């Protein structure tokens, strides 16, 4: 395994030295591949284009992110930014690599969450676009464009994770394969508009299941905070370590989103706009308004105490689906109805 990890450092070193001029591009790509962006941008954008696809993106994101957390606890993968120091291989001749503000994630490294979660969650978008293109284009090359864009983007995300020393190549490959398989398996099986208890029990199962696994491993003598200690030890700047990269931050996001999805689907606002046919202008207005609400909503997720952060993060991602699915479309629909001119009979 050490030889595999050493080869990964060589690849990261080559990327940083040969493609240093693309640094801002790699940082932007790793931002676009962040699982948080799936919840905060890809989900509303997909939802306002297609209700079914948007719900699929949110559901697959929260389930896959939870699975990624469990996989990481069992696989104990190192991250390059600390392994290059901990291994001792480079004490005589230090590797010519450096960290970035997004390098210092605190969870274990295998498999890559960016690749696995994003790969799975973007699968329904890719298949929906492929179906649309297939009905309108005769050229075979045009028909494969959505699949090609999907693969190209995920490959770029994987390379960006290697570039910033967040993952080794084999962790990226594992994430890409696992994400594509999960996306393929889950897309046809996404629950649509189930009873509220289903979503509440899903959120409860995510929290209780994680707690059971955590305390079982802890009882067996496994220290699941080992990666947090290494991240604090070897990160070049303390301000680069963000609390939302901790494992339980993703759990609060996933369980909150599951509960919020159920509340949104059973809200009076959603019932009013469920069968309304919003025009393209109204859909764009919904997306712009939802993105505008991100600022005050994001403020909820950053209290100084770690326990309060988890609580507020849960509430934030519970509220977000309610805004996207119900409150924002309802507000736009009602405003548009008031602005529409009255119809006079002849």
Curated annotation (Swiss-Prot):
Membrane-spanning parts: 25-45, 55-75, 115-135, 147-164, 170-186, 198-218, 255-273, 284-304, 308-328
Disease / disorder: Neutropenia, severe congenital 4, autosomal recessive: A disorder of hematopoiesis characterized by maturation arrest of granulopoiesis at the level of promyelocytes with peripheral blood absolute neutrophil counts below 0.5 x 10(9)/l and early onset of severe bacterial infections.
Positions annotated as active site in the UniProt record: 114 (proton donor), 167 (nucleophile)
Effect of residue 44 to S: In SCN4; complete loss of activity; purified neutrophils from patients have higher levels of spontaneous and staurosporine-induced apoptosis than controls
One GO cellular component term: endoplasmic reticulum
Record topology, Cytoplasmic segments: 46-54, 136-146, 187-197, 274-283, 329-346
BP GO annotations: gluconeogenesis; glucose 6-phosphate metabolic process; glucose-6-phosphate transport
UniProt effect for mutating residue 118 to R: In SCN4; complete loss of activity
EC top class, as a word: hydrolase
Protein name: Glucose-6-phosphatase 3
Outcome of substituting residue 116 to T: In SCN4; complete loss of activity
Species in which this protein is naturally found: Homo sapiens (Human)
Reactions performed catalytically: D-glucose 6-phosphate + H2O = D-glucose + phosphate
GO MF term (any one): glucose-6-phosphatase activity
Similarity comment: family membership: Belongs to the glucose-6-phosphatase family.
């Amino acid at each position: 395994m050490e030889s595999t990890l050493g080869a990964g450092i060589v690849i990261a070193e080559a990327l940083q030295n040969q493609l240093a001029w693309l640094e801002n591009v790699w940082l932007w790509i790793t931002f676009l591949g962040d699982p948080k962006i799936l919840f905060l941008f890809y989900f509303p954008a997909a939802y306002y284009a297609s209700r079914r696809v948007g719900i699929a993106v949110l559901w697959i994101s929260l389930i896959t992110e939870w699975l990624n957390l469990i996989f990481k606890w069992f696989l104990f993968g190192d991250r390059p930014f600390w392994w290059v120091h901990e291994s001792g291989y480079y004490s005589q001749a230090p590797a010519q690599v450096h960290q970035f503000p997004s390098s210092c994630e605190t969870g274990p490294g295998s498999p890559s969450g960016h690749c696995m979660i994003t790969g799975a969650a973007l699968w329904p978008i890719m298949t929906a676009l492929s179906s649309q293109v297939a009905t309108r284009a005769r050229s075979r090359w045009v028909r494969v464009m959505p699949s090609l864009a999907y693969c190209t983007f995920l490959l770029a995300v994987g390379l960006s994770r290697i570039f910033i020393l967040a993952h080794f190549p084999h962790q990226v490959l594992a994430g890409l394969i696992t994400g594509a398989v999960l996306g393929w398996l889950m897309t046809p099986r996404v629950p649509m508009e189930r009873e509220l208890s289903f979503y509440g029990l899903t959120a409860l199962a995510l929290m209780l299941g994680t707690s059971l696994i955590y305390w079982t491993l802890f009882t067996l003598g496994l220290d699941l905070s080992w990666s947090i200690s290494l991240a604090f030890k070897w990160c070049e700047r303390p301000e680069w370590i963000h609390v939302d990269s901790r494992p339980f931050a993703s759990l609060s996001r996933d369980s909150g989103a599951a509960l919020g999805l159920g509340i949104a689907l059973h809200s009076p606002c959603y019932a009013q706009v469920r069968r309304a046919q919003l025009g393209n202008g109204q859909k764009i207005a919904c997306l712009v308004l939802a993105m505008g609400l991100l600022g005050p909503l994001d403020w909820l997720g950053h209290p100084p105490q770690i326990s309060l952060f988890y609580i507020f993060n849960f509430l934030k991602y519970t509220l977000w689906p309610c805004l996207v699915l119900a409150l924002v479309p309802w507000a736009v629909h009602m405003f548009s109805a008031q602005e529409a001119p009255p119809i006079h009979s002849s």
